[in-house]
């Protein structure tokens, strides 16, 4: 295996040049931009793209000076993919757990002072369509001081979702739904933090306060 860094396709070499030397080319560049919600209030202070937050806590030099308001008790993460789960875990983990990770030092200090105690993960689709993987969703239940809360009605499949699940006949997909339904059967135990999953909900507006800061979200 050979690694070549600091190479920009289209600047240092072209796709045609790559094709001339390799039989197979795999593009794994990652998502560099976020999908906007296109709702009123999206540009208020306190509303951030996931890529900014992830780059910040991972220590990307272009993002280390970003400021995130962690003084509020509740935060919402819109999306039900692995990135959403990663963001939610960072917000929910204790400082002791974060210390064992490779999180940037400045992000650790900011999160150590965080007052966020409730994190909502909001999905526009249902549990069958959720994009997160089973290891990711299972790991949230292993965090030290977090109650994972899933409303039972939202993981009770309607006929269309059940038909899709049966049609796919995918054991991994069945297991994903089972994990969510297991969380739904658990009663909260009074832990310091709560991670709440909501399905089939769509943000329609972010409402700001007199300072232009996000105050609440309308679904």
Task: Locate the predicted segments by residue.
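Hydrophobic beta-strand segments of well-ordered beta-sheets in folded domains
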Residues: 1, 73-75, 119-120
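Feature captures the FAD/FMN-dependent oxidoreductase FAD-binding
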Residues: 1-44, 187-190, 196, 204-217
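Phosphate-coordination loops involved in phosphoryl transfer and adenosine-cofactor binding
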Residues: 6, 71-74, 116, 200
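A short acidic, often aromatic-flanked loop/helix-cap motif at beta-alpha or helix-coil junctions
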Residues: 9-13, 53-56, 155-158, 204-205
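Flexible loop residues that form catalytic
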Residues: 30-31, 80, 124
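Glycine-rich dinucleotide-binding loop and its adjacent helix/turn
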Residues: 34-113
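Dinucleotide-binding/catalytic capping subdomain of oxidoreductase cores
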Residues: 46, 85-219
């Amino acid at each position: 295996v050979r690694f070549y860094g600091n190479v920009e396709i289209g600047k240092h070499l072209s796709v045609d040049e790559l094709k001339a030397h390799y039989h197979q080319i795999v593009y794994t560049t990652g998502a560099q931009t976020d999908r906007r919600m296109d709702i009123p209030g999206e540009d208020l202070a306190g509303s951030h793209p996931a890529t900014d937050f992830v780059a910040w806590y991972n220590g990307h030099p272009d993002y280390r000076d970003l400021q995130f308001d962690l003084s509020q008790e509740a935060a919402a993460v819109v999306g039900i993919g692995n990135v959403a789960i990663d963001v939610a875990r960072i917000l929910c983990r204790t400082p002791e757990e974060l210390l064992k990770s490779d999180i940037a030092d400045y992000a650790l200090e900011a999160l150590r002072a965080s007052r966020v105690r409730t994190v909502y993960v909001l999905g526009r689709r249902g549990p069958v369509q959720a994009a997160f993987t089973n290891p990711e969703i299972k790991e949230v239940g292993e965090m030290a001081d977090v109650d994972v809360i899933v409303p039972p009605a939202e993981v009770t499949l309607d006929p269309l979702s059940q038909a899709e699940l049966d049609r796919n006949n995918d054991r991994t997909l069945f297991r994903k739904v089972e994990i969510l339904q297991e969380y739904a059967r658990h009663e909260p135990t009074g832990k310091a933090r709560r991670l709440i999953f909501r399905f089939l909900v769509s943000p329609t507006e972010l409402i700001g306060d007199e300072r232009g800061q996000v105050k609440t979200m309308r679904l």
